[in-house]
């Protein structure tokens, strides 16, 4: 199939810039011969006792850093204790050896790769990487969610968004060195630090949120337990590559970035027992689905830590997941291609057409849909 087969138009007005007033107050579209539009807090009505919801418990880190010169980097993947792969915008303004200072801490550009990808080295002064990012970084919101503005004046610039404020205190043009200091002024009116994180996130490492889980509240999790619906957790650290476009018309020539996954023995056991009993496995998000389908062999989920670059396209043989809870995805994206593989090409085009007609909210902060595997 061609990339153009997965194209459709989403009106800009439907791209959610902010989350719903409450996590579970977003809309939920149940796919079927007759689609059902309801509120997310009603999802329990569409699940059965003995079913298993599998969540991705990865936690989003503040992976976006301002380097000055109107340059930002989004960390993508940890390569070693102090080295990371990242995406720079615009990368053309960076040179190997450039140094950027955040108070007494330093970032060095060590390598430039294709498509804006770079490698950086962190030299930190008595601070952990996570604490450094908590202090100087920002939530890595997707590019289509608009928050940041900048005001530049001679050799000083102020970067401000609704979560955090960073100030460049000096720029040394000769040495390509930029000095930063953090400020105590935190602007959090949109609450992105909270709402771009699932309530059950535990293991730090994602640079984009597994957004299907953003709708869940403690109340919903409690009600699932009361109804006898089981839960389990896997880990997939979402990389910045999740936002990279497919650039080949032949979709099978697209290469996915690798992402770290982990499945505990306890989780593997409960999934396999659920399958043996003939109950449904519901993946909360495409990251969970990709983790489960990457880990299985002959219908059995294997525990362990591994990396996956799985790209699921129509014709894929799903072995584990029966239902998929996910948000609405970009046209011509790997994730829209995935749901077409899972729930049917014609069916997903029709579902999205219906969602647009109903003015449902799209993408990371948007509404959710519950899909059934096409058999």
From Swiss-Prot:
Its EC number is 2.4.99.17. Belongs to the QueA family. It is an enzyme of class 2 (transferase). This is S-adenosylmethionine:tRNA ribosyltransferase-isomerase. GO terms for cellular component: cytoplasm. InterPro entries: QueA (IPR003699), QueA_dom1 (IPR042118), QueA_dom2 (IPR042119), QueA_sf (IPR036100). One of its GO terms (molecular function) is S-adenosylmethionine:tRNA ribosyltransferase-isomerase activity. Keywords: Cytoplasm, Queuosine biosynthesis, S-adenosyl-L-methionine, Transferase. It comes from Rickettsia typhi (strain ATCC VR-144 / Wilmington).
């Amino acid at each position: 199939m061609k990339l153009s087969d997965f194209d459709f138009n989403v009106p800009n007005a439907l791209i959610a810039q902010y989350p719903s007033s409450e996590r579970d107050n977003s809309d939920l579209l149940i796919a079927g011969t007759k689609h059902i539009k309801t509120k997310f807090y009603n999802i329990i009505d569409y699940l059965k006792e003995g079913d298993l919801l599998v969540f991705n418990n990865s936690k989003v880190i503040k992976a976006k850093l301002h380097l000055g010169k109107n340059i930002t980097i989004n960390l993508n993947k940890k390569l070693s204790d102090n080295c990371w792969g990242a995406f720079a915008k615009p990368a053309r303004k960076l040179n190997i050896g450039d140094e950027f200072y955040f108070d007494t801490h330093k970032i060095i550009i060590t390598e430039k790769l294709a498509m804006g990808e770079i490698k950086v080295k962190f030299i930190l002064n008595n601070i952990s990487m996570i604490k450094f990012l908590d202090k100087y970084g920002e939530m890595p919101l997707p590019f289509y969610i608009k928050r940041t503005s900048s005001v530049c004046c001679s050799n000083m610039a102020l970067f401000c968004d609704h979560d955090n404020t960073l100030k460049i205190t000096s720029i040394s043009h000769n040495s390509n060195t930029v000095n930063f200091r953090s400020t105590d002024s935190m602007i959090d009116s949109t609450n992105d630090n909270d709402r771009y994180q699932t309530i059950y996130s535990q293991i730090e490492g994602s640079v984009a949120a597994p957004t299907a889980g953003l709708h869940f509240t403690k109340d919903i999790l409690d009600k699932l337990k009361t109804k006898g619906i089981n839960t389990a957790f896997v880990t997939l650290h979402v990389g910045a590559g999740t936002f990279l476009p497919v650039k080949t018309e032949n979709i099978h020539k697209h290469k996915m970035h690798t992402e770290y996954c982990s499945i505990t023995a306890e989780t593997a056991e409960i999934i396999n027992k659920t399958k043996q009993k003939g109950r449904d496995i519901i993946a909360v998000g495409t990251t969970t689905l990709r983790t489960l389908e990457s880990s299985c062999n002959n219908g059995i989920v294997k525990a362990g830590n591994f990396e996956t670059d799985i790209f699921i396209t129509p014709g894929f043989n799903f072995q584990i997941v029966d239902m998929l809870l996910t948000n609405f995805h970009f046209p011509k994206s790997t994730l829209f291609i995935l749901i077409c593989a899972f729930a049917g090409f014609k069916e997903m085009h029709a579902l999205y057409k219906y969602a647009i007609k109903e003015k449902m909210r799209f993408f990371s902060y948007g509404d959710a849909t519950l899909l059934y595997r096409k058999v």
